[in-house]
From Swiss-Prot:
This protein's record includes keyword Metal-binding: yes
Amino acids binding Zn(2+) 2: D111, H112, D187, H226
Record bears the keyword Metal-binding: yes
Gene Ontology MF terms: hydroxyacylglutathione hydrolase activity; metal ion binding
Organism: Xenopus tropicalis (Western clawed frog)
Region Disordered, annotated ranges: 285-313
Family membership: Belongs to the metallo-beta-lactamase superfamily. Glyoxalase II family.
Protein name: Hydroxyacylglutathione hydrolase, mitochondrial
Gene Ontology CC terms: mitochondrial matrix
Binding-site positions, substrate: K196, F197, F198, H226, E227, Y228, R302, K303, E304, K305
Length: 313
């Protein structure tokens, strides 16, 4: 979400300016004191997803954001995705005993890129990647299919404009590994949803979701920018009330979130079963939208979602 016009803009500004000496990560406090103005979301548990070749720590930030610490287990080199709260990043890096070398910025909005300039002052020598000159502290501007390494991990940049005109998703693999790849999707693809079309069109979001992300291996794990899963699934249920995959995922998401755990990651295979924006080619979604083609359907359901009143149940 953008800082301007953002319903939490005041909180965003205050949380960034306030010096954070300590944070809760898992069940332990880090640092010397606790930030008085932390949101309930920030106090939720972090989550570590471990594979034999890479480790991803989901770090809650602000009111519903996630930062992701990506660790190459072989070299102990690390990258951070969208480090809006730099002190929390530094604390996580120290906890894991790794070397932070890289910042992966999905887009320029404050709640994703707003910590870059502070972080590069806290950690020297960082390479800051992104696809938009509006990104703070940018050192490496990338484009579609740009590749680079984080230790032994291979990172491929995927250009997915629409939410913003310079949005990049980061697809991470380990050569010769049998483990699932990971993709960090920022505000393009959410669990059961997609980002608002602030600087783009239905055609662009269709291309991003179906023709770019949708062609990645189905087992790819999706790490998105926000904890919007429950509300997204309630809209998905509204679009397809008879879809059992949506009902099952919503029940799971409620239970998982209420237990203090993130509902992320999902997989691309899952998204095609319950995400209406990934299902715009399905007859049931087109009939709900009153459209006959997937791109018109994409535009119609995004417009409807923008004004959707989320039910309590």
């Amino acid at each position: 979400m953008m800082l301007f016009g953002c319903r939490r803009s005041l909180w965003c500004a205050l949380s960034f300016l306030g010096a954070a000496a300590g944070y809760r990560v898992g069940s332990a406090y880090l640092g010397t004191s606790v930030l008085q103005n932390q949101t309930p979301f920030e106090l939720r548990n972090s989550k570590v997803v471990t594979q034999c070749t890479m480790k991803v720590e989901l770090i809650p930030a602000l009111t519903d954001n996630y930062m992701y610490l990506l660790i190459d287990e072989e070299s102990k080199e690390a990258a951070i995705v969208d480090p809006v709260q730099p002190q929390k990043v530094v604390d996580a890096v120290k906890k894991h005993g790794v070397k932070l070398t890289t910042v992966l910025t999905t887009h320029h909005h404050w709640d994703h890129a707003g910590g870059n300039e502070k972080l590069v002052k806290m950690v020297s020598g960082l390479k800051v990647y992104g696809g938009d000159s509006r990104i703070g502290a940018l050192t490496q501007k990338v484009s579609h299919l740009t590749t680079f390494q984080v230790g032994s991990l291979h990172v491929k940049c995927l250009y997915t404009p629409c939410h913003t005109s310079g949005h990049i998703c980061y697809y991470v693999t380990k050569p010769n590994s049998t483990e699932p790849p990971a993709v960090f999707t920022g505000d393009t693809l959410f669990v059961a949803g997609c980002g608002k079309f602030f600087e783009g069109t239905p055609e662009e979001m269709y291309a991003a979701l179906i023709e770019v992300l949708g062609r990645l291996p189905p087992e790819t794990r999706v790490y998105c920018g926000h904890e919007y899963t429950i509300n997204n699934l309630k809209f998905a249920r509204h679009v397809e009330p008879c879809n059992d995959a949506i009902k099952q995922k919503l029940a799971w998401a409620k239970e998982t979130y209420n237990s203090g755990e993130p509902t992320i990651p999902s997989t691309l295979a899952e998204e095609f079963t319950f995400n209406p924006f990934m299902r715009v080619r399905e007859k049931s979604v087109q009939e709900h939208a009153g459209e006959r083609d997937p791109i018109s359907t994409m535009g119609a359901i995004r417009k409807e979602k923008d004004h959707f009143k989320v039910p309590k149940d």
